[in-house]
Structures are given as structure tokens and as C-alpha cells.
């Protein structure tokens, strides 16, 4: 956002910037910030043991090597408990930070989080393989509100919608539902590392350069 840009531009030389969340947004922000402000200390907090842990290790290594070469510190296995002015708590331990940028993802709206149904630890609705709420089979949950193994995205919601359409079609025709729904496969994504490098994961293939 514009406010974040202004706050970063006003930071003095040697300031510490903590980026919480090492998904695509965090990765791209860290790389762009490094190229625009070489005088800052940048820390990228990742909840997992490696960047983009749900994708091939080749992709993780490529990104990690770029960060290592450009002096961006990746902090794995991070759990940010609390953020205070000038301080961040990672796994209960305080660290001095001049600016925190939160890219750790989104959560469902409050009305969804307060529904009297089973939720994941991230506040998303637990659904069955047909994308239904188990206790309310006439209710389907799609997109950011659904608890799925993939990161929320428009692409994922569209794939869910296609499966739900098939489920509804069978129900309207009084046909039995399949014992096992096909696994949802996200087609891929693109990411950048600064102005001149990038990466892609398309149809189970990793492309870097």
C-alpha cells in the first residue's frame, strides 16, 4: 500500500525490516525491497522449515539462494506471537524490528469465524471432500473461507466451483456421489525476484531464470 511504501522510504540507513510470511507476496516484497533499499537489514519470517515447502525443493533452493546472495535473512519455523512498536515476538522471543510488514495471508470474515461449526486452527471452515459442511450438507464453502491444503487463491476457488457443479448435477439427477473426489491440482503460479529474475511452477514443472 501507499502508506507502507512511505514508511519504508522514511526508514534510516541500517533499519531492520521484518516481513512476516514467506508466500509469494512476502518473497516478492523482500526481493523488491532489497533492490530498492540495499542499506536495510531485511528479515523474512517463514512459518515452515523451507520457503514454499509444499512445492519442489528445487524451487525453494532457487529462492533461498537468491536471498542468501542478496543478504536477505530467511527465518524458518517462525511463529509470530505478538507485534509491538519496535519489537516482534518470534516463538516467544522478542526481537528488535523497526518496521513490520505483514504478508502472512488472510482470514475469513468475522461472521464466518463465528459460525457454530467446526473450524481449523486458522479459522477456516472444515469441509468434506464434496466441499460441504459435514453437519449441513446443503451448505458449500468455497475460496478463502474453506480449509484446504492449498493456499487460498482465485484459481483454487474456481477449481472448487467446478467440482461443486458436478456434485450438484449428480444430486439433481438423483445419481450417487463418487466415493472419492478427484484431487484438486492447482495449475501453477509465477513469481519475481527483483527486476531481472523470477520463477514459475506450471503443470508440476519448476522453471527458474
Identify the role of each PLM range.
Residues 1-13, 87, 94-162, 166:
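FAD-site-proximal beta/loop scaffold in flavoenzymes
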Residues 1-20, 24-37:
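Glycine-rich dinucleotide-binding loop and its adjacent helix/turn
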Residues 16, 39-43, 138:
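Residues at the starts of beta-strands that form the adenosine-phosphate
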Residues 22, 47, 144, 195:
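Cofactor-binding loop segments of dinucleotide-utilizing enzymes, especially the Rossmann-like FAD-
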Residues 29-30, 54, 111-113, 151-152, ...:
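Short glycine-/acidic-enriched loop or helix-start segments at secondary-structure transitions
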Residues 36-129, 176:
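A Rossmann-like FAD-binding core segment of flavoenzymes
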Residues 160-209:
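C-terminal, flexible cofactor-proximal segment of oxidoreductases
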Amino acid at each position: 500500500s501507499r502508506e507502507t511504501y512511505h514508511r519504508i522510504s522514511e526508514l534510516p540507513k541500517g533499519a531492520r525490516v521484518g516481513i512476516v510470511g514467506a508466500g509469494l507476496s512476502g518473497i516478492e516484497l523482500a526481493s523488491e525491497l532489497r533492490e530498492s533499499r540495499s542499506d536495510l537489514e531485511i528479515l523474512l519470517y517463514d512459518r515452515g522449515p523451507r520457503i514454499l515447502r509444499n512445492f519442489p525443493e528445487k524451487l525453494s533452493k532457487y529462492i533461498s539462494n537468491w536471498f542468501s546472495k542478496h543478504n536477505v535473512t530467511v527465518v524458518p519455523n517462525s511463529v509470530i506471537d505478538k507485534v509491538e512498536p519496535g519489537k516482534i515476538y518470534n516463538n516467544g522471543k522478542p526481537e528488535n524490528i523497526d518496521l513490520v510488514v505483514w504478508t502472512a495471508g488472510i482470514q475469513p470474515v468475522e461472521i464466518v469465524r463465528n459460525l457454530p461449526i467446526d473450524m481449523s486452527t486458522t479459522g477456516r471452515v472444515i469441509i468434506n471432500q464434496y466441499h460441504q459442511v459435514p453437519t449441513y450438507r446443503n451448505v458449500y464453502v468455497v475460496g478463502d473461507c474453506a480449509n484446504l491444503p492449498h493456499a487460498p487463491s482465485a484459481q483454487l476457488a474456481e477449481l472448487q466451483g467446478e467440482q461443486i457443479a458436478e456434485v450438484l448435477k449428480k444430486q439433481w439427477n438423483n445419481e450417487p456421489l463418487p466415493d472419492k473426489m478427484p484431487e484438486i491440482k492447482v495449475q501453477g503460479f509465477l513469481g519475481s525476484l527483483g527486476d531481472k529474475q523470477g520463477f514459475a511452477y506450471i503443470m508440476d514443472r519448476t522453471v527458474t531464470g
